């Protein structure tokens, strides 16, 4: 039986029993990209909602559903997939880097006897990997925010990026290379908050459900705990996310940026748009979180199975 094989065994019958790390990282990035194809419209709506009513202007969209129907009406079906190339590049850079860093740190901190890191150490590894991946993925994030925001502007104010690579080249040429990392601090902070909130809230939610006496440790309990965790994670990370979105989309006015820093964004949003505007786009953000995670793991499992069938069997 495979379970009785020694932990250090790397080969069986002359063939590797598992796929190489490089293949795992590649599949992680591809799985995230595959999931993005399905949830990109939700990302677009979330970004539009976060920019709606900026600077005490009248809100363009009353609700997320209103935003979606308005985009479909004015920009067509193709419009809800604006920025897809940037979304795909974000996954290729962020997910691959995060997975790579997590795997390396996890293996480094695993005991000589094979004992895995404890809960707190795993949480720290996850937050470190998330923050590093967010830094690497920030240029794609900047391009994504700008591309998804373009359709809400008058024609003469649009940036008109053709695709993510055109966006990156133009941003670097017109505004300088450092602009590609504009908003990297809130982007990294969001990654840390998301990782921390997911870990803490999932464990607590699962324990609460089990203690209630109405649930057993099965897939229904896991699903409900995941939904609660997603709710907590969305609520915790959205104020940081709107800071990121506003900073990455801002323009220079008379040689000065619209916002001085993240705190300035928070204060202006609360002052001119109301406290609860920090959670604009809550519905599409929450609706995106679950499906993206589920689809990512489905694609990842299928690619791993295909690789084993083609290269590791026999």
UniProtKB/Swiss-Prot annotation:
The modification N6-acetyllysine is found at residues 73, 256. The chain crosses the membrane at residues 24-42, 83-101, 119-140, 183-202, 222-240, 281-300. Pfam families: Mito_carr. The modification Phosphoserine is found at residue 6. InterPro entries: Mito_Metabolite_Transporter, Mitochondrial_sb/sol_carrier, Mt_carrier_dom_sf. It is found in: Mitochondrion inner membrane. Its main location: mitochondrion. It is a multi-pass membrane protein. It comes from the Eukaryota. GO terms for biological process: gluconeogenesis; lipid transport; malate-aspartate shuttle. Keywords: Acetylation, Antiport, Lipid transport, Membrane, Mitochondrion, Mitochondrion inner membrane, Phosphoprotein, Repeat, Transmembrane, Transmembrane helix, Transport. One of its GO terms (cellular component) is mitochondrial inner membrane. The modification N-acetylalanine is found at residue 2. Solcar repeats lie at residues 23-108, 117-208, 217-306. It catalyses: (S)-malate(in) + 2-oxoglutarate(out) = (S)-malate(out) + 2-oxoglutarate(in); malonate(in) + 2-oxoglutarate(out) = malonate(out) + 2-oxoglutarate(in); succinate(in) + 2-oxoglutarate(out) = succinate(out) + 2-oxoglutarate(in); maleate(in) + 2-oxoglutarate(out) = maleate(out) + 2-oxoglutarate(in). The modification N6-succinyllysine is found at residue 57. GO terms for molecular function: oxoglutarate:malate antiporter activity. The modification Phosphotyrosine is found at residue 102. Catalyzes the transport of 2-oxoglutarate (alpha-oxoglutarate) across the inner mitochondrial membrane in an electroneutral exchange for malate. Can also exchange 2-oxoglutarate for other dicarboxylic acids such as malonate, succinate, maleate and oxaloacetate, although with lower affinity. Contributes to several metabolic processes, including the malate-aspartate shuttle, the oxoglutarate/isocitrate shuttle, in gluconeogenesis from lactate, and in nitrogen metabolism. Maintains mitochondrial fusion and fission events, and the organization and morphology of cristae. Interacts with SMIM26. Belongs to the mitochondrial carrier (TC 2.A.29) family. This is Mitochondrial 2-oxoglutarate/malate carrier protein. It comes from Mus musculus (Mouse).
């Amino acid at each position: 039986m495979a379970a009785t094989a020694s932990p250090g065994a790397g080969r069986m019958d002359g063939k590797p029993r598992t796929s190489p790390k490089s293949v795992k990282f590649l599949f992680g990035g591809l799985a995230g990209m595959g999931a993005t194809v399905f949830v990109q419209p939700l990302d677009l709506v979330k970004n539009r909602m976060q920019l709606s009513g900026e600077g005490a202007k009248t809100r363009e969209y009353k609700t997320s559903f209103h935003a979606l129907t308005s985009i479909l009406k004015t920009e067509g079906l193709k419009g809800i997939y604006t920025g897809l190339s940037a979304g795909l590049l974000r996954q290729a850079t962020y997910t691959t880097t995060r997975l790579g860093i997590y795997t390396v740190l996890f293996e480094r901190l695993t005991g000589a006897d094979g004992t895995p890191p404890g809960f707190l150490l795993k949480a720290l590894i996850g937050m470190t990997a998330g923050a590093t991946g967010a830094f690497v993925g920030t240029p794609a994030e900047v391009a994504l925010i700008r591309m998804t925001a373009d359709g809400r502007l008058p024609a003469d104010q649009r940036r008109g990026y053709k695709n993510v690579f055109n966006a990156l080249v133009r941003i670097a040429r017109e505004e300088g290379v450092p602009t590609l990392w504009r908003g990297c601090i809130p982007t990294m902070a969001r990654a840390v908050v998301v990782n921390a909130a997911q870990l803490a809230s999932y464990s607590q939610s699962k324990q609460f459900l089990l203690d209630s006496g109405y649930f057993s440790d099965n897939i229904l309990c896991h699903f409900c705990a995941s939904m609660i965790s997603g709710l907590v994670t969305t609520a915790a990370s959205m104020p940081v996310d709107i800071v990121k979105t506003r900073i990455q989309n801002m323009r220079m006015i008379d040689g000065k940026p619209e916002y001085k820093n993240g705190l300035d964004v928070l204060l202006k949003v609360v002052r001119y748009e109301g406290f609860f505007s920090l959670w604009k786009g809550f519905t599409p953000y929450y609706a995106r979180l679950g499906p993206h995670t589920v689809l990512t793991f489905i694609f990842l499992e299928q690619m791993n199975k295909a690789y084993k069938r083609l290269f590791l069997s026999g």
